[in-house]
Amino acid sequence: MSAVAEITVTPVLVADLFVEGGRMPVYAHLVDHPDARVLVDTGLTQLHPLVADLDPRPYPLDTQDLDLESIDIVVNTHLHFDHCGGNRLFPGTPIHVQRTELEDALNQDGHTIREWVDAPGLTYVPVDGEFELLPGVRLLPTPGHTRGSQVVVIDNGGRPSVIGGDVAVWFGELEEAATEGLRIVHALDPELVWLAHQHEPWRPRAPR
């Protein structure tokens, strides 16, 4: 795949949750590409009884300094509630998600908040496996967190960057690479990996 040097990634804080005695951030990631503007995951915009125990504090995208109409493409790394709750803000915008993930979200009890996935006017683009979204930007299946999880791989020349969603929640999981998805990410030899629940990207340790 050819590199496109002008691709940038900007994290956008969209919520925080109460997890293991503290507040955990939830990030979406904005990809500015010469050909399109891509939003990876959409956070959440409202509360729901199914996740009340996590005490969510949403920072909805439509209340932030972000022009929603400037978004050309949405990607869901997976369809858990904190990654798809803002999908409803993008009716008619193509939303790329792995087909297996969409099927599980719509058919399996307990996978997500189904009405947030199946909101009116949404246009899903089911993806089967690896997919080139734009020059220098591809979607790559990374089963583990869910069987239909995917990451976004960005080639700016040299080692790639990865927007990982929940391929890992903690940096230590990336070090261990215990799931198929994490092993796939490691095989990319990435320069950095943006995670949905960390303020800063993970960078592999320099060899000793």
Which residues does each predicted region cover?
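Zn-dependent metallo-beta-lactamase
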Residues: M1-L39, L44-H48, A178-D189, R203-R208
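Metallo-beta-lactamase
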Residues: S2-A3, T45-Q46, V51, Y59-D82, V97-P141, E176-E191, ...
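Core dinuclear metal-dependent hydrolase active-site scaffold
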Residues: P11-D16, V26-D32, V38, D128-G157
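Pre-active-site segment of Zn-dependent metallo-hydrolases
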Residues: V19-G21, A36-I73
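Short, conserved loop/helix-junction motifs that constitute active-site signature segments
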Residues: R88-P91, A187-L188
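Short hydrophobic/aromatic-enriched beta-strand-loop microsegments
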Residues: P94-R99, V162-G165
